[in-house]
Structures are given as structure tokens and as C-alpha cells.
């Protein structure tokens, strides 16, 4: 349940919905496994996984939701070879070239015949709805997966006025300034990893890892006009993260010491531990968002 990435969105309008109403809305779009002829299925599932019993898990007006996606694995090369074999056979028997429309129909037939025997894979994506911040945090490093979750949530609710998080000034300008100054604003602390890019179309990319970012070798690249597009940070003593210029957060990791705060909870009740972990994570992510917005100079004004 602990989030590992953050793709960030904000509401254009206040999000007002009670847990029960949200649960009811999501119930019409619950996940069901692929049948023999389904190529994929997508829907809401228990927010807390197998141990959970509800599509929405809420605490302190913070709502956790989860989507599950199942996809049949049909290698393109297998389909291509089967199609070529079938086309060659028919063209040889009928002594003519098949039209594109006929080949497309054959391809559909081949896919249909392969689906019942195909392996499938499942993936889950969670999101944290924070009405107090008017934000949604999606636990995904993929903007596409985040948008898929939001699209289904929008379908369930009827509307979902959200936009990607954006700031008054480009994120890279702040990251570059922090690197020049040798420190990030408290409670953030720079670590030993960064990626710098030239703003020129044909410019280069330089990556530093496990290196003192205050060294002249690093700063020399700033003098040539490169800007920082990725920067490793610590948030207090609780979270390590990689902040990117698109305002997304990768490699989010809560420290063992922080997570140990709930070690005495739920030794005999796994659900109690999950509930406590959710409350702990939610509170710290809210604190992280407050600090991030402040450090990056505030959010861009939304247009009504």
C-alpha cells in the first residue's frame, strides 16, 4: 500500500463526495477477470487489496482507491507469423492476392482463436484523493496509467474536473537554483543524484549519481546553460524521492524508521495495521505536498 511514485493532479473545483457515495459510484465499475474471449479488463478493486473489503478506504477525509487491469499477453510476432502462414495458404489455394480488409479479418480470427490459450497479467494502480488539498495523488510512474485511472473515476462520478499539477514558475528553474546554491529549502535536503539537460534542441544530457553535487564538475554544467530536470531529495527524516521537472515524483520511499511507527499496531489484526499505515502515509504525503508547493513557489492559478 505504501506509494512508490506520485503523478500529481489538482481539482479545478472543490471535491465534495462522502465515502459512501464514492463507494456506490465505484461499485458500478468493479473489476472482473477476463473471460476466454476478453483481451483486457479494467475496473475498481478493493482499496487495501486482498485483506480489504471496500472499494474506498477513508480516514480523516482522505480516500484511497485502486484499479486493477488484466491483459492477455499475445506476442505480436506470434500473430504476425500465424497471419503470414494463413494468408500464404489462401493466396496459394485461390491463386490471388488478399485485400487488406481480408487480411484484417483473418488477423481478428487468429486473435480470437489464441485468446483462450493466452496467459494474462494483472497490474494495480492506487490513488489518494485529498479534498483538503484539492489534489489527487496517483501511485504510478506512468502518466498513461494515471490517466486511465482518472478516466474510469470520471466515468463513475459523471465528472472529474482535474488537471496536472503546475507551478507558477517551471520546476526546473527551482531545481537549478537549489543546485547552484548547494542546498534545497528546508525541510528538503539534496542528495547525490541529478540529471541536467541543455535547453538547446541539440543539447546534451548529463547524469550524476552517487556524487557530491556541490563539486565544480557538476556546477560547470550549469555555467553552460544546462538546467536540472531531476534531483534526488530527502523530505525530513521520513521520505526519499526523485523530483522531476514535470512535477512528478519517482522512487518515493518511506524510511524504515518512519514506517516502524506502527510496529505495535495490529500484531493480531492485519486490517488494523493497514488502517494505521494508511493514516500514517496519508498524513506524511499531505505534509510533503504542503512543503513541495511552498518550495516550488506556489501553484499556477487555475482558469475557471
Curated annotation (Swiss-Prot):
Gene Ontology CC terms, in alphabetical order: bacterial nucleoid; cytoplasm
GO biological process, one term: regulation of DNA recombination
Gene Ontology molecular-function annotations: double-stranded DNA binding
Superkingdom of origin organism: Bacteria
Pfam families assigned to the protein according to its UniProt record, in alphabetical order: RdgC
Keywords for the protein's UniProt record, in alphabetical order: Cytoplasm, DNA recombination
Intracellular or extracellular location(s): Cytoplasm, Nucleoid
Keyword S-adenosyl-L-methionine belongs to the record: no
Entries under PANTHER family matching the protein: RECOMBINATION-ASSOCIATED PROTEIN RDGC
Family statement drawn from the similarity comment of this UniProt entry: Belongs to the RdgC family.
Function: May be involved in recombination.
Protein name per Swiss-Prot or TrEMBL: Recombination-associated protein RdgC
Amino acid at each position: 500500500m505504501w506509494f512508490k511514485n506520485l503523478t500529481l493532479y489538482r481539482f479545478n473545483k472543490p471535491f465534495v463526495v462522502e465515502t459512501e457515495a464514492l463507494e456506490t459510484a465505484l461499485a458500478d465499475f468493479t473489476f472482473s477477470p477476463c473471460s476466454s474471449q476478453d483481451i483486457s479488463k479494467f475496473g475498481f478493486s478493493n482499496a487495501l487489496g486482498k485483506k480489504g473489503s471496500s472499494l474506498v478506504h477513508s480516514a480523516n477525509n482522505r480516500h484511497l482507491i485502486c484499479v486493477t487491469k488484466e491483459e492477455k499477453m499475445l506476442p505480436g510476432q506470434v500473430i504476425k507469423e500465424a497471419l503470414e502462414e494463413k494468408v500464404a495458404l489462401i493466396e496459394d489455394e485461390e491463386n490471388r492476392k488478399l485485400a487488406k480488409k481480408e487480411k484484417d479479418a483473418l488477423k481478428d480470427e487468429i486473435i480470437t482463436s489464441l485468446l483462450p490459450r493466452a496467459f494474462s497479467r494483472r497490474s494495480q494502480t492506487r490513488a489518494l484523493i485529498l479534498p483538503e488539498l484539492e489534489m489527487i495523488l496517483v501511485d504510478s510512474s506512468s502518466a498513461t496509467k494515471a490517466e486511465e485511472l482518472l478516466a474510469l473515476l470520471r466515468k463513475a462520478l459523471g465528472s472529474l474536473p482535474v488537471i496536472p499539477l503546475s507551478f507558477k514558475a517551471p520546476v526546473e528553474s527551482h531545481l537549478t537554483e537549489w543546485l547552484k546554491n548547494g542546498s534545497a529549502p528546508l525541510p528538503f535536503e539534496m542528495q547525490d543524484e541529478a540529471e541536467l539537460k541543455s535547453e538547446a534542441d541539440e543539447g546534451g544530457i548529463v547524469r550524476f549519481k552517487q556524487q557530491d553535487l556541490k563539486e565544480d564538475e557538476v556546477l560547470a554544467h550549469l555555467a553552460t546553460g544546462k538546467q536540472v530536470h531531476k534531483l534526488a531529495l530527502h523530505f525530513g527524516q521520513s521520505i526519499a524521492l526523485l523530483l522531476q521537472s514535470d512535477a512528478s515524483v519517482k522512487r518515493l520511499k518511506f524510511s524504515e524508521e518512519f514506517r516502524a511507527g506502527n510496529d505495535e499496531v495490529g500484531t493480531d489484526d492485519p486490517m488494523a495495521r493497514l488502517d494505521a499505515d494508511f493514516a500514517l502515509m496519508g498524513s506524511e504525503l499531505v505534509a510533503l505536498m504542503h512543503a513541495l508547493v511552498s518550495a516550488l513557489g506556489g501553484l499556477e492559478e487555475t482558469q475557471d
